């Protein structure tokens, strides 16, 4: 059991018999009336998000979540295959458990997978990854001064927008949560 004072992003709660992960929360102390906590909860099974308001100090049942470091091995077309870094056991994860950032994963990338009662709930990908640009249109003289962007295909097959000065073969850092270009990596 936990109280609303223990809320933090990523905490998994049991709400109405379902496992809900806190995505966002905010403690509110109005001038009149009691304090309360606004939360945005994500159902770990279906992925749907809901908004829920709690009175401050309310006790809430938390779920026991076991986090394990795993290595992404490959995608067999229907699921992602990962290996536990301690036991070397392999598991298959459905694409919805990996999230949208999975398109930026290279083989042998470390991923943290959360389990509840032996069942995988979701995977936490690295915040950023470094990937090589497989194809993009060549930059033209003078492109460095303008702030435009162009599409680029990365080595994983994912497509992102990159600055005009980047060329095929450059290595870039990409945010796996948003799919945005962060910076160029010096080789």
From Swiss-Prot:
CC per GO annotation: cytoplasm
Predominant location: cytoplasm
Locations listed in the record: Cytoplasm
Source domain of life: Bacteria
PROSITE patterns: EFP (PS01275)
GO molecular function, one term: translation elongation factor activity
Alphabetical list of Pfam families matching this protein: EFP, EFP_N, Elong-fact-P_C
Cysteines paired by S-S bonds: none
Keywords noted in UniProt: Cytoplasm, Elongation factor, Protein biosynthesis
GO process annotations (BP): peptide biosynthetic process
Biological pathway: Protein biosynthesis; polypeptide chain elongation
Residues annotated as signal peptide: none
Physiological role: Involved in peptide bond synthesis. Stimulates efficient translation and peptide-bond synthesis on native or reconstituted 70S ribosomes in vitro. Probably functions indirectly by altering the affinity of the ribosome for aminoacyl-tRNA, thus increasing their reactivity as acceptors for peptidyl transferase.
The family this protein is said to belong to: Belongs to the elongation factor P family.
The name this protein goes by in its record: Elongation factor P
Organism: Corynebacterium jeikeium (strain K411)
